[in-house]
Amino acid sequence: DVYKRQVNNRSEGLNFRVYNNKDIEFLDVRDQSGMRTYVRSLCFVLFKAVTELFPEGKLFVEHPVSKGYFCNLRIGRPIELEDVKRIKQRMQEIIAENIPYHRIECHTAEAVRIFSERGMNDKVRLLETSGSLYTYYYTLGDTVDYYYGNLLPSTGYLKLFDIVKYYDGLLLRIPSRENPEVLEDVVKQEKMLDVFKEYLNWSYIMGLNNAGDFNLACEEGHATDLINVAEALQEKKIAQIADTIFHRGENGNRVKLVLIAGPSSSGKTTFSKRLSIQLLTNGLKPFPISLDNYFVD
C-alpha cells in the first residue's frame, strides 16, 4: 500500500493535489518517510483511543525501542492487561470506521488557544516558541492533535499494528520495513530502555519535558547551561567506565582490551581519547588504536 508521495523530491501527503506536470514517487512502509507517516497516523489513533477511554490520563510516545515505540501512559495507577485490551479494541474500532484525518491551517495564536482549552500545554509551549505566524493541526473526529509531518488520508489505511504491555508502559508494534505484511519482532533491549529512562529523568530534573521546554530554555539564555550539564554527565559516565575497568584489575580480572563500536562520525575516536584520560587518572596507561586507519586492499 502507498502511504506517501515525493512530488518533485518534496514529501507530500496523499491528499496533495497535482495541477501541473511533476515527478511523483509513491512510497510505502519500506521507505523511511512512508514508515514515519504510517507511525504518526497510528499514534493519533492511539491518542484518540486513550483520550476516550481515560479522559484524565496522559499519553507520552517517548522513544523507539525493541522494534516498536515505547509509550508511557499515566492514569493514576499501574497499567493492567485489561487496560491494554480495551485500548487495542478501541483502536481497531477507530480504524474500522475509516475516519478521515483533517489538516487545518490557521494563525498560530488560534492553534495555541485550541490546545490551551484542551489542557495540552506541551503543544502550547511548542507552538508559542515556534516563531511561525501560521501553523496547522490535525483533527480525527472530535480529537485534536499536532504532528510535524503528513498523515494518511484516513484511519482505514492502517492495516497492521499491535499494542502490548511492556515493562511499566506500552509498546506500539509496527509493520516490518522488509516485509510489510508482518509485524516487527519484539527484541528485548533492557539496557537501551534503561538509557532512555535515565535520559528522561535528567530531562525532567532540568525541566525539559518536550521540545517546547527546550525552545523556551534557549530563548531565556540557558542553552550554555544545558550544554555544560550534558557534557558533565557524559564525563561522569566515562569516569565510571574507567573506574570499572580499574577495579576489575584489582580483583584479578585485568582488562587488556576495550572495543568501541559505532557508525561513521559517531564520536568513537573522541570517546577513546576521553576514556584514555580517565584511565590515566586511575594509574593505567592506555594505548588508543583507531581502526579507521587500517583497510583491506
Predicted regions and their residues:
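Hydrophobic positions on the alpha1 helix immediately C-terminal to the Walker A/P-loop
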Residues: 271, 275
